[in-house]
Amino acid sequence: MQFMFAALKLELGDTLYYLLIFAALLLLVKHFAWGPVTKMMEKRRQKVISDLDQAESDRKKAALLANQREAALKDSKQEATQILSTAKRNAEKTKSSIISQADQEAAAIRERASKDAAQAKTDALNEARDQVADISVAIAEKVISKSLSAADQKDLVDQFIKGLND
């Protein structure tokens, strides 16, 4: 060992002195710095653990919110589908009702028109019958009032027809 110390040009006393100083420094560092450093490291470790736990908690909350939003979106889509289905059914009912009502009104209009046409026909026939009767009576009166030759009868009918046109 002496050889080692001689090669380094250190004396045994100096070496012991350095060792004592080093040990004292270690004790001082342990007493004054090691505690605060380990406390700081422990706080840092606890903070990292807390941050990891918080991140995991936030991830779970985000996943839960995403699931809730997805369920709400699914419910909204289902509700929209139901609303559209109901609206289509109501539109079909309204369409059928309007068509049925229009058909009924058209049938009523056709029936009224048919009745009006029949009434007009009846009125025209009655009026024509009345006119024919009046004409017949007028001709009979003229025939009775004078005895007519064929030419007179022809003139009488022509005059009567002219009288009708006027």
Swiss-Prot record:
It comes from the Bacteria. The chain crosses the membrane at residues 15-37. Keywords: ATP synthesis, Cell membrane, CF(0), Hydrogen ion transport, Ion transport, Membrane, Transmembrane, Transmembrane helix, Transport. Pfam families: ATP-synt_B. It is a single-pass membrane protein. GO terms for cellular component: plasma membrane; proton-transporting ATP synthase complex. It is found in: Cell membrane. InterPro entries: ATP_synth_b/b'su_bac/chlpt, ATP_synth_F0_bsu_bac, ATP_synthase_B_chain. GO terms for molecular function: proton-transporting ATP synthase activity, rotational mechanism; proton-transporting ATPase activity, rotational mechanism. Coiled coil: none annotated. HAMAP family: ATP_synth_b_bprime. F(1)F(0) ATP synthase produces ATP from ADP in the presence of a proton or sodium gradient. F-type ATPases consist of two structural domains, F(1) containing the extramembraneous catalytic core and F(0) containing the membrane proton channel, linked together by a central stalk and a peripheral stalk. During catalysis, ATP synthesis in the catalytic domain of F(1) is coupled via a rotary mechanism of the central stalk subunits to proton translocation. F-type ATPases have 2 components, F(1) - the catalytic core - and F(0) - the membrane proton channel. F(1) has five subunits: alpha(3), beta(3), gamma(1), delta(1), epsilon(1). F(0) has three main subunits: a(1), b(2) and c(10-14). The alpha and beta chains form an alternating ring which encloses part of the gamma chain. F(1) is attached to F(0) by a central stalk formed by the gamma and epsilon chains, while a peripheral stalk is formed by the delta and b chains. Belongs to the ATPase B chain family. This is ATP synthase subunit b. It comes from Lactobacillus gasseri (strain ATCC 33323 / DSM 20243 / BCRC 14619 / CIP 102991 / JCM 1131 / KCTC 3163 / NCIMB 11718 / NCTC 13722 / AM63). The gene is atpF.
